[in-house]
């Protein structure tokens, strides 16, 4: 089993569908059906982890529905409601150069060109035009567009992002 520190939360089980063990999924991914690319899921809740194998999946009216092996009735499916879906980070597809998964950016330290620590990436958000880093630090929350105009380097080894961003912006 993969160490829990190497797993990324990808969504959660929000409910059941029908009587044959199908589940409704709230995916935290750009495309909800991309979760179907991973045959093995880890489900976590209240310190408990369950490993499951994906048997089938489909998108119905924009909603992801899945069926796990061994979950064959509504009661069994209902017992999984509220579990977080975790996928091992090493199962992700490789990224292109200068392309990053949000999960890899969260937690990175952001510094500006003057080596002033702006804080750590707490989250990202989509704006339609580009993604935006949400940085929490001693200077409060800072929002920096994740575009080459402001982001100079992303060093995944040292977990540091260098930004062309002043404290007075």
From Swiss-Prot:
S-S bridge residues: none
Q: Which GO terms describe its molecular function?
A: ribosome binding
> Could you tell me the Gene Ontology terms of the biological process aspect for this record?
ribosomal small subunit biogenesis; rRNA processing
This protein's name = Ribosome maturation factor RimM
Membrane-spanning intervals of the chain: none
Principal cellular location given in the protein's record: cytoplasm
Protein family per UniProt:
Belongs to the RimM family.
């Amino acid at each position: 089993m993969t160490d829990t520190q190497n797993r990324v939360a990808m969504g959660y089980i929000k409910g059941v569908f029908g009587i044959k063990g199908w589940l409704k999924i709230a995916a935290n991914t750009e495309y909800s059906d991309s979760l179907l690319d991973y045959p093995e899921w880890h489900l976590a809740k209240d310190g408990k982890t369950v490993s499951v194998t994906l048997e089938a999946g489909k998108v119905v009216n924009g909603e992801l529905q899945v069926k796990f092996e061994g979950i064959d009735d509504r009661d069994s499916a209902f017992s999984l409601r509220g579990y977080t879906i975790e996928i091992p980070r090493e199962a992700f597809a490789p990224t292109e150069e200068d392309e990053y998964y949000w999960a890899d950016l969260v937690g990175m330290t952001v510094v500006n060109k003057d080596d002033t620590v702006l804080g750590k990436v707490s989250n990202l958000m989509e704006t339609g035009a580009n993604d935006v880093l949400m940085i929490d630090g001693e200077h409060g929350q800072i929002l920096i567009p994740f575009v080459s105009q402001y982001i100079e380097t992303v060093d995944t080894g040292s977990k540091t992002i260098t930004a062309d961003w002043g404290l007075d912006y």
